[in-house]
Structures are given as structure tokens and as C-alpha cells.
Amino acid sequence: MARYTGPSWKVSRRLGISLSGTGKELERRPYAPGQHGPTQRKKISEYGLQQAEKQKLRHMYGLTERQFKNTFNKAGKLQGKHGENFMILLEQRLDNIVYRLGLARTRRAARQLVNHGHITVDGKRVDIPSYQVSVGQVISVREKSAKNSAIAESLEVSSFVPEYVTFDAETLTGSLNRLPERSERAAEINEAFIVEFYSR
């Protein structure tokens, strides 16, 4: 399945989450798109709930179905709880760390920064969004990209940086200090539903 590249507000309203991170797309119309959106009261099956949770998380991180499932399978080979390991692997993606540092307003924009070669890891250019960032690695904006307008605009509006990352706005450099705790990850996601979905 290809990555969705259409309007993110449609997916946000359909799934009931804000993919932009601002919540604006849900303020005026907090229901699925379409003329019958506000009156829909369809009962959802257990399978439907599990699938919806999977779709929420997949779209939140902007992955294709194959990328999503591959990451899920990789998490299953690690010690510990499958769902928790899965969420941590998603958080360790380079595009997500770039987003968490405030260098991009959305994960989609962060993925473009990485794809276009604007980001380095430990001084080396990395253009793979799925690259897994390890604790202690240094993420920087390339010197040639320091005046990128998209990065500058994002830094102007971004104020919250999670405690598990640090960022120096002067040098445009940050790092992953530690793995995020459950309370610091997406509270609106129930990863147990996703584990159940793939266990069927």
C-alpha cells in the first residue's frame, strides 16, 4: 500500500486525531468528512476498533502498510512488551526525532527534510527517514541548510520539546537523551489493540 499523500485534514477528521499537531482540523468539524459526518452513529466491531487504532498510528507516523508491519515485526523480536517496543521504535525514527526537535511542524515535513539531505547524524548526512536514532546520537541541520525557510518557520512556532530530547537553537543541534516513557508517547493510542489486530 502506497503512502497517503492527500490532504491530511481528511484523514484527521476520519480517524479523530490531529495529524498536523495543532488540532485545528478538528475544532470546527470533529467528525468524519462527508455530508453525513455529524450524524453517523455506526456501531464498530472489535475488529473495527483494532483496525482503526492501527490506522491512527500508521497515519500519525506517515508510514506505508509494509513499513508499519515491518516495524511491528521487528519490535516482536526484542525483549519486553511487543506494543511498547513497537511504539519506541516508531519514536526512534529519524524523521520523528527531527519533528520532536521542532525542526519541522509535522512529521510529513520532517520526512521531506530528511529525504532532501538537510539532516546529519553524528556529522554524516542521512537521507533515510526510517533510520533508527540511538540514545546519544547527535542530530544536526547541515550547514548549507541552516537558513532553510521551512526550518526557520517551524522554530518560530515550536515551543514544546519533549524531555527525552535536547535541542540547541543556536547550533540547530539536538540529541536523543533516553528512550521515551509511556506517558511521553501518544496518549490517544492504545497499542494493545494493534498487537491484537496483527495477532488475529
UniProtKB/Swiss-Prot annotation:
<feature type="region of interest" description="Disordered">
    <location>
        <begin position="22"/>
        <end position="43"/>
    </location>
</feature>
<dbReference type="GO" id="GO:0042274">
    <property type="term" value="P:ribosomal small subunit biogenesis"/>
</dbReference>
<keyword id="KW-0694">RNA-binding</keyword>
<feature type="domain" description="S4 RNA-binding">
    <location>
        <begin position="92"/>
        <end position="170"/>
    </location>
</feature>
<protein>
    <recommendedName>
        <fullName>Small ribosomal subunit protein uS4</fullName>
    </recommendedName>
</protein>
<dbReference type="InterPro" id="IPR002942">
    <property type="entry name" value="S4_RNA-bd"/>
</dbReference>
<dbReference type="InterPro" id="IPR036986">
    <property type="entry name" value="S4_RNA-bd_sf"/>
</dbReference>
<dbReference type="GO" id="GO:0019843">
    <property type="term" value="F:rRNA binding"/>
</dbReference>
<dbReference type="Pfam" id="PF01479">
    <property type="entry name" value="S4"/>
</dbReference>
<dbReference type="GO" id="GO:0015935">
    <property type="term" value="C:small ribosomal subunit"/>
</dbReference>
<dbReference type="InterPro" id="IPR001912">
    <property type="entry name" value="Ribosomal_uS4_N"/>
</dbReference>
<dbReference type="GO" id="GO:0006412">
    <property type="term" value="P:translation"/>
</dbReference>
<comment type="function">
    <text>One of the primary rRNA binding proteins, it binds directly to 16S rRNA where it nucleates assembly of the body of the 30S subunit.</text>
</comment>
<dbReference type="GO" id="GO:0003735">
    <property type="term" value="F:structural constituent of ribosome"/>
</dbReference>
<comment type="function">
    <text>With S5 and S12 plays an important role in translational accuracy.</text>
</comment>
<keyword id="KW-0689">Ribosomal protein</keyword>
<keyword id="KW-0687">Ribonucleoprotein</keyword>
<dbReference type="Pfam" id="PF00163">
    <property type="entry name" value="Ribosomal_S4"/>
</dbReference>
<dbReference type="InterPro" id="IPR022801">
    <property type="entry name" value="Ribosomal_uS4"/>
</dbReference>
<comment type="subunit">
    <text>Part of the 30S ribosomal subunit. Contacts protein S5. The interaction surface between S4 and S5 is involved in control of translational fidelity.</text>
</comment>
<comment type="similarity">
    <text>Belongs to the universal ribosomal protein uS4 family.</text>
</comment>
<dbReference type="InterPro" id="IPR018079">
    <property type="entry name" value="Ribosomal_uS4_CS"/>
</dbReference>
<dbReference type="InterPro" id="IPR005709">
    <property type="entry name" value="Ribosomal_uS4_bac-type"/>
</dbReference>
<keyword id="KW-0699">rRNA-binding</keyword>
